Amino acid sequence: MVPSTFSRLKAARCLPVVLAALIFAGCGTHTPDQSTAYMQGTAQADSAFYLQQMQQSSDDTRINWQLLAIRALVKEGKTGQAVELFNQLPQELNDAQRREKTLLAVEIKLAQKDFAGAQNLLAKITPADLEQNQQARYWQAKIDASQGRPSIDLLRALIAQEPLLGAKEKQQNIDATWQALSSMTQEQANTLVINADENILQGWLDLQRVWFDNRNDPDMMKAGIADWQKRYPNNPGAKMLPTQLVNVKAFKPASTNKIALLLPLNGQAAVFGRTIQQGFEAAKNIGTQPVAAQVAAAPAADVAEQPQPQTVDGVASPAQASVSDLTGEQPAAQPVPVSAPATSTAAVSAPANPSAELKIYDTSSQPLSQILSQVQQDGASIVVGPLLKNNVEELLKSNTPLNVLALNQPENIENRVNICYFALSPEDEARDAARHIRDQGKQAPLVLIPRSSLGDRVANAFAQEWQKLGGGTVLQQKFGSTSELRAGVNGGSGIALTGSPITLRATTDSGMTTNNPTLQTTPTDDQFTNNGGRVDAVYIVATPGEIAFIKPMIAMRNGSQSGATLYASSRSAQGTAGPDFRLEMEGLQYSEIPMLAGGNLPLMQQALSAVNNDYSLARMYAMGVDAWSLANHFSQMRQVQGFEINGNTGSLTANPDCVINRNLSWLQYQQGQVVPVS
């Protein structure tokens, strides 16, 4: 038998070994907290990974994974799931987790398009209390909450964010800073007040002034940018120029010595093609001059209404609109007398170039692919056209290397470095109307549209632009045929200022919104009004015959003191409106191309003479004239952000996809006269 003292000594010697084994065994099975690296932004994963880690963890580590999962879900567009998980967060959080939760609350509000809610939450956060990666997200949230509307606060947020970013993100930040600066009007820029120590912001504002002074002269702009870089060598924009200004420095004018004009010269669209050709050739041989932005129109002659011309689908509209959709249908027997221009004009013009070689190609006689091959063989330096939308879409599929000013635009715009899109469309007018109505301080618009695809497209375009400008819900109401309107007048029913909300479909991954809104049926009186408030603006898309019923029906139902201002597209404009019509339209504002609003009297008379006083065709003639100006400034429109031409169809600028936007003239019926809107 072994003595007990020996057993105790042996056990005592073995105990440290056993304890050590147990300790090391425990260390071997413990998983270190990996969430910290992800919380600090040094590692990233998707929501599925974070959710799996959350299920396998406990306590603070579990909360960290939960916060990371919420952030990933928001980034992946799974807002509903993110909100559900956010609401499951415990009340007890450490300081770091509490800061992350607050920032996530802001990002969820932004994902829900609750910009006011996001701004309220941002006001409660002190950026200095955040980690560096959180600060970058904080400033991005400030930027997103601004909805792209240029302001001094947006500029400060972009400037504060820039040092926190990597090289790729820095370029995006600098481009966004320049986008905010170049989106301002000169009047807005002049009202900005900054602090004495805001050196970076001062540098950006000086660059903005260089751009304002020289944007229509690429050579002067190049010199101005180079001088600015020397004066502000430490400005982030001097070290890494905005992409748009890099394009300016690389600017080379396009040649217009050999022009290919692609138009339909046979079939239903021939009248429009030949009219555009007339305007283009007149500008080529005579040149163009800047058009006055504001005019003062006198009353028109009292002439009977003329019959409407035949319409042709697919012409001069980005969304299968007929020419009648975008031009209005009332030919005039006599030009509308107007007074002299009231304001100064822009300096951009397109000189005549009779020696330029111009060749016309008939797109109605052979396939476009054959025409493009022939154009290339003929050595054309620029293509103007085609006019029909299906031809423009075929042009895109061809991947032509030629510079092209298309006279229409496809359903889905493609940004091509060699293509610009110029179209007269009701959608353009609707977007211009949204800007005009918003500028007049209106908050609750109703769009009154025909029951047709045209009406749907106009409603969608107006609502998109309205929300882009920071507006809320837009209402829409549809009307039927002229006979239905006449029956409404005879029945004394009138038109109530109520409508159904235009619900825009969700945006795609590329940020584009689908073309058609979700529309409801014609509303009754007890349906929605805008956010529970009274409609204060009505945008009407109607022919002269339709609006002659619509305006009295609005007054019949709502009285003259409804408080809503009425606006109309150029579709309602007729150059021969008699005194009774003008008095009936009292107070109505409507848009018109500057040429027909009196901004270019000589060309107006020339155009009306060429088209037998048909106002619809006169607009197409003006389009041909402006196409010459745009072709001569193709490189500027394509490369120089903010370049502007005071054209006959509108004040012409290009968006980043080189879609030519038109700002129209606005006129108003006042005591039997037609006057510019003040």
Swiss-Prot record:
Lipidation (S-diacylglycerol cysteine): 27
Single GO molecular function: enzyme regulator activity
Biological process, per Gene Ontology: peptidoglycan biosynthetic process; regulation of cell shape
A GO term from the CC aspect: cell outer membrane
CDD domains the record matches: PBP1_YraM_LppC_lipoprotein-like
UniProt KW keywords: Cell outer membrane, Cell shape, Lipoprotein, Membrane, Palmitate, Peptidoglycan synthesis, Signal
One Pfam family, short name: LppC
Domain of life from the UniProt record: Bacteria
Signal peptide positions on this chain: 1-26
Subcellular locations according to the entry: Cell outer membrane
Biased composition, class Low complexity, residue ranges: 330-339, 513-526
Matching InterPro entries: LpoA (IPR007443), Lytic_TGlycosylase_superhlx_U (IPR008939), Peripla_BP_I (IPR028082), TPR-like_helical_dom_sf (IPR011990)
N-palmitoyl cysteine lipid sites: 27
Chief location: membrane
Membrane topology, record value: Lipid-anchor
Knockout mutant characteristics: Absence of both LpoA and LpoB leads to a decrease in peptide cross-linking and to cell lysis.
Span list, region Disordered: 302-339, 507-526
Subunit details: Interacts with PBP1a.
PANTHER family: PENICILLIN-BINDING PROTEIN ACTIVATOR LPOA (PTHR38038:SF1)
Family per similarity comment: Belongs to the LpoA family.
Function according to Swiss-Prot or TrEMBL: Regulator of peptidoglycan synthesis that is essential for the function of penicillin-binding protein 1A (PBP1a). Stimulates transpeptidase activity of PBP1a in vitro.
Protein name per UniProt: Penicillin-binding protein activator LpoA
Organism per entry: Escherichia coli (strain K12)
Gene name of the encoded protein: lpoA
